[in-house]
Amino acid sequence: MRLTDITDTKQLSVKINLPYQTNIDKNTMANPTTKQELLTAIADGYAKLNEQIDKMSAEEIAAPFTFTADPKKCGVRWQNDRCLRDLLTHLYEWQVLMEIFVMNIREGHPKDYLPDEYRKNYHEMDRMLVEKHRNTTLEEAKELLAQSHQTMHDLAGSFSEEELFTKGYFKCTYTTTMAAYFLSVTASPYLQAVKLLKTHQKNTQVRDKRC
């Protein structure tokens, strides 16, 4: 089953913002300027996320997030995530939307990245994406993200250098690049997620000490 088979494809053709910032933390890796660098950034970001998850204890994985109560600490995009499963399925759903975005371009009817019902209310959109997976297990969430991550890597690799890095090459990307869209649903949020999980670890350890 393709990822696009399980997601509503209704879109609205108006200018939208990218889901996440696209600038990579320069202390971690440089912003990609070639296709190979983009693919490396996507792969490395995913590897770092999995490395961070592997470092977490069972107690830390089971503990609910506390940092999401303060948007200044986690950013509005992560406010509705209450646990690791939420974070992973959130990433997965953003990548599903990206696959739909690319498929629409290739099928000759390009549309904007976000569906109509999501574009006008990001917070409600993120809440809906999290609620959609209330019955998804953590292991299922990991598998879903593994599949969508591979899809993102393969799709990014299928574009030419010109298609990826020319601003406005596709009208539906407006004044930005296709590479920026791929970064905004892969490497950038992967690295943001790593930072959030490290914060969660510290918070959990502090709570344990207080107990």
Positions of the model-derived regions?
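N-terminal amphipathic/hydrophobic targeting modules at extreme N-termini
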Residues: 3-8, 13
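Short, Lys/Arg-enriched N-terminal segments with co-localized hydrophobic residues
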Residues: 11-28
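A short small-residue
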Residues: 27-30, 72-74, 125-133
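Extreme N-terminal tail/first-helix region
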Residues: 27-54
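A non-catalytic, amphipathic alpha-helix used as a structural packing/dimerization or gating element
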Residues: 40-48, 143-151, 188
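Short secondary-structure junction/hinge motifs that connect adjacent elements
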Residues: 55-74
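Short, contiguous alpha-helical
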Residues: 68-124, 153, 163-211
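Acidic/histidine-rich alpha-helical segments that form the ligand environment
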Residues: 120-165
